[in-house]
Regions:
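Long, compositionally biased stretches enriched for glycine and/or charged residues
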Residues: 1-118
Length: 118
C-alpha cells in the first residue's frame, strides 16, 4: 500500500498469471516472479526461460492445477480424477481406484456445492 500511495516503487515476489513471464511454462499458469509496485499498480518482470529441469519440476504441479481448473469450468468429474492422478504426491501414495474413491468421497462431502459435477 505504501508503494501505491507514495509512488515509491517496491519490489516483491508476486504470484501472477504467467503471460510469458517464464517462457517455458504455460501462459495460463500462475507463477511467482519479481514484481514492482507503484502508484500505477503491479508490474511483473519477465524472467525468460528456466533451466529445463526446473521447468519440468514446475510442470508436475502446474498440469494437475490446470486440469482442476478445467474440471471446475466444465463440471466434469473425470477431470477431477485426472487432476488427482497427475498430482505427484497423490499418485505416489494411492492407487487409481483409491484416487477415484477419495475424489468421490470429497465431492459427496461437499454436497450442494458439487451437485453439478457429472
Amino acid at each position: 500500500m505504501e508503494a501505491v500511495v507514495t509512488d515509491r516503487p517496491y519490489k516483491i515476489g508476486g504470484n501472477v498469471l504467467n503471460n510469458g513471464y517464464i517462457e517455458n511454462l504455460p501462459s495460463e499458469a500462475c507463477v511467482e516472479v519479481p514484481c514492482y509496485i507503484d502508484a500505477r499498480g503491479v508490474h511483473p518482470v519477465k524472467v525468460g526461460r528456466l533451466p529445463e529441469q526446473l521447468a519440468a519440476m514446475n510442470r508436475t504441479n502446474i498440469n494437475p492445477q490446470l486440469l482442476a481448473i478445467e474440471a471446475a469450468v466444465t463440471k466434469d468429474r473425470s477431470k477431477i480424477y485426472q487432476a488427482a492422478m497427475l498430482d505427484p504426491h497423490t499418485a505416489g501414495v494411492l492407487s487409481i481406484d483409491e484416487i477415484v474413491r477419495m475424489c468421490d468421497e470429497l465431492i459427496d462431502a461437499h454436497g450442494e456445492y458439487m451437485k453439478d459435477y457429472k
